[in-house]
Amino acid sequence: MISSRKTSLHILLSLDNDAAARSAAGAAIEFAALGAGVTHEMSRDFAAAFSAAARLISHRQGETVQRLSCVIDNRRGEVRLELAAEDGSSLRSVPATSPDAWKAISRRVSVLQWKPAHAHGGKKAGRVRSPVNLLMVQKRRGVEAGAAGSRSRRK
C-alpha cells in the first residue's frame, strides 16, 4: 500500500503522431497497469486516458511531446494526465479516470517509468510499434522489475 499523498505513473515516450504508435503505447500502458496490480477496468481507464491525450497531441501540430505523466493526487482526490513539451513546459492536463477510481489506484500503483527500450542500452526501437518495444521499470526497494513482474534483479 502506498502511504504518500501523491503518486505518479510516469510514461516517458517520444511520441509520433502516428495512429499505430499511439495504439501500441496505449496497449503497453494497459499492460503496465495490470502488471502493477490495478484491476482490468482501471487499466483500461489508463489506456483510454492515454488515447484521449494522444488525440490532443495530434491536434497540436509542430509541438513535440516528450513526457506524458499520469498523476494520482490524493490531496485533491483526482487522477489526471499532464503533457509536457520538448522544452519541459506543460501543455495540457486532462482527466484520466473517474473520481471514484483514484483511491483504489493509489493503493496499488507505485512509481512506474516508461522509456524507449534503447534508453536502457538495448537496440534502438525508433517509434513505438508494440508494447514489447517499451521497458517498464518499477522501482521498489532497490529492485528493478519487468512489466510482468516475473523477473527482477538487484541494482
Residue ranges with predicted function:
Residues 1-48, 150-155:
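Bergerat-fold GHKL ATPase/HATPase_c domain
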Residues 1-12, 56-155:
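Conserved beta-strand-loop-beta-strand hairpin that lines the nucleotide-binding pocket
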Residues 39-65:
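Conserved ATP-binding N-box helix of the HATPase_c
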